[in-house]
Amino acid sequence: MFKKSNKEPQLDAFASVPMMLESSALKQYSDQGHWHNQFHDQVVMRIDETIFSILFNNTTGAPNSPIRTLVGMMILKESFVWSDSQLFEHCRFNLLVRSALGLFNMNDPLPVESTYYLLRKRIYDHQKQTGEDLMGKAFAQITSEQIKEFDVNGRSIRMDSKLIGSNIALFSRYEIIHQTLCMFFKTLDNVEKSTLSLADLEQLEKLATEEPLKTIYRSTREEVRSRLQPIGIISYKLLTLFGNLQNESFLLLRRVFNEQYKVSEDQQIELRLKEEISSSSVQSPHDPDSAYRNKGDQKVKGFSVNITETCSEEGLNLITNVLVEKANIPDTAFVEPAIQATIEVTGQIVEKAYADGAYQSPANDKCCENIDMVFTGIQGAESRYDLEMTPKGLQVTDIKTGECIQAVLVRKQENSKEDRWRIGTPNGYYYFGQQAIRTSTMRREMKGRSLEELHKRNNVEASIFQLGFPLRNNKSKYRGQIKQKMWACCRCLWINFVRILNFTKQLCQRTFKTTFLLVMAPFCSGYLEHRI
């Protein structure tokens, strides 16, 4: 049964840390503006433990340690880029870290490793089974309280995305198929293996002992391709024979088989052409969630992380939403959920949003109907013709010659409801559709905006940099979309905390300066009058 932890733990008269420190150390330890005290107040104490209550019932029992302490440990781990052993070392012996987590007495027990890992596992399993993102809910709840306390203006936002590689090796097609088959074969028990023919069993046992990387190294492309055919046949036999299993390894084998092979009408197994394989296909059997994307000169097998933050010229700006999807998901898919999540977190209507050209799409026009979308660029080369709808119809301006032409409305294309226009050119007719008109309108709007307004989006790149700062070669140390989202939420909570810490320091400095001037003003004026 879930129980809330005590928000006000008692200090031990003999084990309290402040009782053991000398004056200078005590001054820093007790400084409410220092990071450890601010982290405890702004992050740890804001964690609503009831969000995680669904993980505990009469069967699983109550949590052994406070949930807010465990979640705080997760955030600190990703913030300081610690390993698990470093995390527990700091939590045991670093007084500032212990204070940040609410462990104010020397004898306050730290959650043991098994308790920490069990909570992470339960969060992961719960999201995998139900789709409910508990860490995402905790992030939204903490950020919402911070926004209310510091009166953050959420009517103007900006967003950007980053591709992050999963913690997987770059597997070839042969390695993906081979390892997926072997992973399933190793899950079979002796009774299930006894249903296989002797020839099939020998083939599978031989494949299980093979090192696919060495096979690729010493084989030609044709030899590797020829080896894929019998692997496809034996995979199909296993899928047919053990169709009632439906476990994780079976579902993965079936997915890889359908992505890499096809069954002809005469029940022949055929290897798919490279062009037929989707970018969302399995990139590694060790991380089926990851996907492939080639963006400019960056090739990634992993995920795309989208960050949305407030964009106010005055006051504090915080990250309001973080989304993690497969790498091949376009940025346009982030717009609507990011805006809706920001509205829920801030409790304010979004009036203006800054983004680059990758976010613009006709599919988002409806959800952004009352929002001023400021795009800093448009994908694709600029057209030679500027298009503008007038009461008389479509007016086309040749940018190269300056000539204005009235376009003619033509018959719609088959199975299409969109109007089309055309103009005559020396090379024949030139046609324009709704997409071309929309793009031209957006380019005209973008050119009409000031450079200062267009540059406001650039600051979100600093948030993207801070998010990915601990990554090596833009690769995460985690696998799977759920774990990547947990990592991203922890990083964004830390980024928000650092902003709050810096903001409160500046606020204190300004308050001190203002108070000093108010106090000294009468004395200064009297001194000046006396001198005159």
How should these model regions be labeled?
Residues 95-97:
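General structural concept
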Residues 86, 91, 105, 109, ...:
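Anion-binding and metal-coordination hotspots
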